[in-house]
């Protein structure tokens, strides 16, 4: 996440997933729930809901009912739907929207508590966007659609009783045929727990120790950032320590994940507004990844190789220490706020392929399990170089993040394990199980998140870390031999 700004908490909470939108197929207006248990869909019209700061309009053609809701121009603007359920039950939620002003995000809040973020694709027509699942109580419930990015139109929501999740069909082996014994052992262990347990994780060893102080339990997984090994940072005096932290956690029986806030190889603005150490942001550099990859003869392509080779040195240290790594490069690419995603999906996928080839085939680094970190099929580099899928989700309420989980199920055809690689709020175990959101691990970001009661209260952390469903460091000892 890069978190001097995370990102000013400005609503960048879930990545775009425009391809998940499906053409509208309506036919019902607001319907009363059936008296007997039903598997049929129920649609609630937005204009019949409770409006706060929003208004009903009819200018956009194609709406259902008597109108639609617009006016999402303030953070507090929302629609509150009052919905009924004949029993405590899980439902698939979809939102019929028109994002006529560009790609958008909204926040869905269930019964005033847990929230999740949903992305809307830009378009000039009405579409039904899958919005995850909601666990309704027997009787009355509320579903709020809260502004977030704002500037979109809402026609209705539809609730359909969720079908039971089928058994996962996870690939039995890693893509790299030369994967070393440590990587294979870790992958086998992860397969053995997937869908049954979740690994508790934390970004940075310092904040893992904070969790131990707060809960009496230590995260099973620690994520480290190779950011300070970027050559454009090293030449300005940074000294990375994350490899040592990773080895420390591995030596006490833990599992290691790594990401890389890749400071751009060149073209850093280095101004008061955009200092050199923020050089992974698109708006802090003029480095053009598409141009750099356009020819192997240009100077910036050579700089890409230089940087990858510098990170290879650090990954080899972990390899030589027999530490397998859940390796998550080019994270959040589809967001566009990092330079590696600034030019669209094709250059990002090309860069990922270069990383894979350079690290695996050129350097022979075989202790890596490759983790991809975007939701949209347009950005997916392909099954052959991705072992695990993941999402970064920053939404308050300690919810199950079922929207993103279900998107990744579809992306990987349920053959890839799925991780919540970065979260702002640790998910509550009871909700994870109720929603059948079988995240492999979660890793809470550090300062301003794990130590912020608005995101992770002490009570919630203790609930999470003492749950039988959540694996902590003491509970995974000997995983290498399992």
From Swiss-Prot:
SUPFAM superfamilies xrefs: (Trans)glycosidases (SSF51445), Galactose-binding domain-like (SSF49785)
All copies of domain CBM6, residue ranges: 42-160
GO BP field: substituted mannan metabolic process
GO cellular component labels: extracellular region
Activity regulation, short description: The activity is completely impaired by Ag(+), partially inhibited by Zn(2+), and enhanced by Co(2+), Ni(2+) and Cu(2+) by 22.6, 14.5 and 20.8 %, respectively. Ca(2+), Na(+), Mg(2+), Mn(2+), urea and EDTA do not significantly affect the mannanase activity.
Catalytic residues as annotated in Swiss-Prot or TrEMBL: 332, 422
Taxonomy, superkingdom: Eukaryota
Molecular function per GO: carbohydrate binding; mannan endo-1,4-beta-mannosidase activity
UniProt family annotation: Belongs to the glycosyl hydrolase 26 family.
Protein name as it appears in the record: Mannan endo-1,4-beta-mannosidase
């Amino acid at each position: 996440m890069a978190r001097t700004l995370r990102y000013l908490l400005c609503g960048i909470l879930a990545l775009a997933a425009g391809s998940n939108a499906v053409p509208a197929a309506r036919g019902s207006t607001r319907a009363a729930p059936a008296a007997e248990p039903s598997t049929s869909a129920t649609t609630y019209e937005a204009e019949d809901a409770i409006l706060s700061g929003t208004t009903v309009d009819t200018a956009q053609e194609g709406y259902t009912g008597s109108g639609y809701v617009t006016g999402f121009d303030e953070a507090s603007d929302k629609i509150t739907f009052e919905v009924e359920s004949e029993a405590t039950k899980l439902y698939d939620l979809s939102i019929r929207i028109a994002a006529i002003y560009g790609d958008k995000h909204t926040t869905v809040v269930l019964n005033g508590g847990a929230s999740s973020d949903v992305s809307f694709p830009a378009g000039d027509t009405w579409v039904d966007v899958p919005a995850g699942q909601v666990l309704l109580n027997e009787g009355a419930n509320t579903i709020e659609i809260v502004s977030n990015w704002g500037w979109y139109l809402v026609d209705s929501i539809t609730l359909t009783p969720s079908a039971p999740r089928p058994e996962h069909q996870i690939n039995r082996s890693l893509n790299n045929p030369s994967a070393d014994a440590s990587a294979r052992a870790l992958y086998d262990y992860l397969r053995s727990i997937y869908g049954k347990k979740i690994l508790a994780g934390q970004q940075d060893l310092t904040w893992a120790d904070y969790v131990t102080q707060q809960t009496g339990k230590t995260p099973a997984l620690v994520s480290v950032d190779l950011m300070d090994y970027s050559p454009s940072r090293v030449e300005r005096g940074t000294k990375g320590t994350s490899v040592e932290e990773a080895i420390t956690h591995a030596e006490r029986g833990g599992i290691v994940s790594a990401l890389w806030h890749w400071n751009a190889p060149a073209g850093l603005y280095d101004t008061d507004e955009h200092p050199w150490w923020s050089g992974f942001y698109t708006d802090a550099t003029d480095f053009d990844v598409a141009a750099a990859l356009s020819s192997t003869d240009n100077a910036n392509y050579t700089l890409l190789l230089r940087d990858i080779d510098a990170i290879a040195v650090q990954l080899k240290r972990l390899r030589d220490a027999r530490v397998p790594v859940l390796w998550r490069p080019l994270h959040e690419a589809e967001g566009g706020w990092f330079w590696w995603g600034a030019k669209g999906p094709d250059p990002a996928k090309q860069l990922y392929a270069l990383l894979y080839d350079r690290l695996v085939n050129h350097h022979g680094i075989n202790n890596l399990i490759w983790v991809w970190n975007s939701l949209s099929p347009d950005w997916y580099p392909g099954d052959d170089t991705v072992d695990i899928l993941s999402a970064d989700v920053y939404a308050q309420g300690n919810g199950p993040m079922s929207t993103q989980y279900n998107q990744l199920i579809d992306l990987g055809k349920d053959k890839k394990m799925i991780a919540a690689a970065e979260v702002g709020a640790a998910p509550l175990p009871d909700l994870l199980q109720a929603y059948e959101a079988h995240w492999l691990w979660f890793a809470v970001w550090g300062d301003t998140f794990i130590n912020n009661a608005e995101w992770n209260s002490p009570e919630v952390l203790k609930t999470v870390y003492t749950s039988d469903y959540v694996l902590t460091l003491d509970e995974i000892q000997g995983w290498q031999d399992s």
